[in-house]
UniProtKB/Swiss-Prot annotation:
Involved in the biosynthesis of pyridine alkaloid natural products, leading mainly to the production of anabasine, anatabine, nicotine and nornicotine, effective deterrents against herbivores with antiparasitic and pesticide properties (neurotoxins); nornicotine serves as the precursor in the synthesis of the carcinogen compound N'-nitrosonornicotine (NNN). Methyltransferase that mediates the conversion of putrescine to N-methylputrescine. It catalyses: putrescine + S-adenosyl-L-methionine = N-methylputrescine + S-adenosyl-L-homocysteine + H(+). It comes from Nicotiana attenuata. This is Putrescine N-methyltransferase 2. PANTHER family: PUTRESCINE N-METHYLTRANSFERASE 1 (PTHR11558:SF53), SPERMIDINE/SPERMINE SYNTHASE (PTHR11558). NCBIfam families: PRK00811.1, speE. It is an enzyme of class 2 (transferase). Its EC number is 2.1.1.53. The lineage of its organism: Eukaryota, Viridiplantae, Streptophyta, Embryophyta, Tracheophyta. Residues 1-14, 23-70 have a biased composition (Polar residues). Pfam families: Spermine_synt_N, Spermine_synth. Residues 82-319 form the PABS domain. Gene3D superfamilies: Spermidine synthase, tetramerisation domain (2.30.140.10), Vaccinia Virus protein VP39 (3.40.50.150). Keywords: Alkaloid metabolism, Methyltransferase, Polyamine biosynthesis, S-adenosyl-L-methionine, Transferase.
Length: 371
C-alpha cells in the first residue's frame, strides 16, 4: 500500500474520553469532496457528548447521545430516552432515527467534523460524522455491496478504479472480489477515519496493505480534476449529502471532471439520496448528469435500514464509447464464484436479481425522474 497525504494540519479538541490514535493530537477532518463509507454525511446534525453537565447528563441536540442521571430523562423532549443516539437533520424535518447505545468507543472533533463510533444494541458498531450515521457494521452492507457491484458488474474486467471516500474500508472490501482489478486509488480526506478503521475494524484496514491499493489523504474533487484523462474504468463516489462542503460532488463541474477521468465506456456510481425525501435534489443531479455523460444515465435504489426512510439511491452513468447496459449485468459477481477470494465473506445482499430490480422505480418516482 502507498499512502499519500495532501492534508494540511488542523487542530482537534478531543472531548471527554475521546481516544487519540496513532499519535493524533489534532483530530479529525470533515468529509468534504470525498467522504467515508456511506453516503450520508449530513451537515445539519452535529454530535455533542459532553461530561460535566449537571446531574451527569448531556443535552440532546441534532444527533446526540442522551444520558440518565438515574432520576429523570434529560433532553429536548420527554420522548428522548437515556442512552440512545438520535439523528436529526434539516434534510428530513419532522422525523429522526434512534439507536440504543451500548458503549461509546470513540469521539473526536476537528476543524471539519465530529467523528463518533459507538456500539449499538442492534447493528453493531456505528460510525457517525457530524451526528449523521455513515455506516453500521451489521446493517450497512446493502449500501456498500450495491455501490460497488452495480457499476463493476456492468462492465467486463474492470482494471483501474477510483474510490472517493471509503476511509473505513467497506467499499474496498467489496471491490477486492474482482480479480481483474489491477489498481485501486482511494481518496479519503479524513485521516482519523482511517485511524478509526485501523483500531476498530482491523479486518477492513488490512486491505489498505494490498499492493494494488494507493491511499491518498486529500480532497476528492481536486484529485479527480487533476487525474489523467481517460484513466479509470470506474469511479465510485461514496459521498455525504449535497449540502455544505460535499455540495461540489453533485454539481456539473465535478461530473465533468469525472467524465474526463473515465475511459470511453467508463462508469461512475454516486450516492443519490432518497426518493421519499429528496426528489427535487435527485432531479437536479439527473439534469447535471444528462448534460455531461453521453453514454447512459440511470437512477437505482436499494434498502438500507439505518438511513433516512430506509432507502438510498444511486446515480449510474457511463461515458460515450462501448455501450453499458446497467440494468443487465455482464459481470455479475454472484455468478462468478471463482472470483470470490477465500478470505472474503459471502455476499449478504447483492445478487443478479437485486441488480436488475434496483432500476425498477415506483410510479411516482419514475414519472418525476423521466419528466
Amino acid at each position: 500500500m502507498e499512502v499519500i497525504s495532501t492534508n494540511t494540519n488542523g487542530s482537534t479538541i478531543f472531548k471527554n474520553g475521546a481516544i487519540p490514535m496513532n499519535g493524533h493530537q489534532n483530530g479529525t477532518s470533515k468529509h468534504q469532496n470525498g467522504t467515508s463509507e456511506h453516503p450520508n454525511g449530513h451537515q445539519n446534525g452535529t454530535s455533542e457528548h459532553q461530561n460535566g453537565h449537571q446531574n451527569g447528563t448531556s443535552e440532546q441536540q441534532n444527533g446526540t447521545i442522551s444520558h440518565d442521571n438515574g432520576n429523570k430523562l434529560v433532553g429536548n423532549s420527554n420522548c428522548i430516552k437515556p442512552g440512545w443516539f438520535s439523528e436529526f437533520s434539516a434534510l428530513w424535518p419532522g422525523e429522526a432515527f434512534s439507536l440504543k447505545v451500548e458503549k461509546l468507543l470513540f469521539q473526536g472533533k476537528s476543524d471539519y467534523q465530529d467523528v463518533m463510533l459507538f456500539e449499538s444494541a442492534t447493528y453493531g458498531k456505528v460510525l457517525t460524522l457530524d451526528g449523521a450515521i455513515q455506516h453500521t457494521e451489521n446493517g450497512g452492507f446493502p449500501y456498500t455491496e450495491m455501490i460497488v457491484h452495480l457499476p463493476l458488474g456492468s462492465i467486463p474486467n474492470p482494471k483501474k478504479v477510483l474510490i472517493i471516500g471509503g476511509g473505513i474500508g467497506f467499499t474496498l472490501f467489496e471491490m477486492l472480489r474482482y480479480p481483474s482489478i489491477e489498481k485501486i486509488d482511494i481518496v479519503e480526506i479524513d485521516d482519523v477515519v482511517v485511524d478509526v478503521s485501523r483500531k476498530f475494524f482491523p479486518y477492513l484496514a488490512a486491505n489498505f496493505n494490498d499492493p494494488r491499493v494507493t491511499l491518498v489523504l486529500g480532497d476528492g474533487a481536486a484529485f479527480v480534476k487533476a487525474a489523467q484523462a481517460e484513466y479509470y474504468d470506474a469511479i465510485i463516489v461514496d459521498s455525504s449529502d449535497p449540502i455544505g462542503p460535499a455540495k461540489d460532488l453533485f454539481e456539473r463541474p465535478f461530473f465533468e471532471a469525472v467524465a474526463k477521468a473515465l475511459r470511453p465506456g467508463g462508469v461512475v456510481c454516486t450516492q443519490a439520496e432518497s426518493i421519499w425525501l429528496h426528489m427535487h435534489i435527485i432531479k437536479q443531479i439527473i439534469a447535471n448528469c444528462r448534460q455531461v455523460f453521453k453514454g447512459s444515465v440511470n437512477y437505482a435504489w436499494t434498502t438500507v435500514p439505518t438511513y433516512p426512510t430506509g432507502v438510498i439511491g444511486y446515480m449510474l452513468c457511463s461515458t460515450e464509447g462501448p455501450e453499458v447496459d446497467f440494468k443487465n449485468p455482464v459481470n455479475p459477481i454472484d455468478k462468478e464464484t471463482t472470483q470470490v477470494k477465500p478470505k472474503l465473506a459471502p455476499l449478504k445482499f447483492y445478487n443478479s436479481d437485486i441488480h436488475k430490480a434496483a432500476f425498477i422505480l415506483p410510479s411516482f418516482a419514475r414519472s418525476m425522474i423521466e419528466s
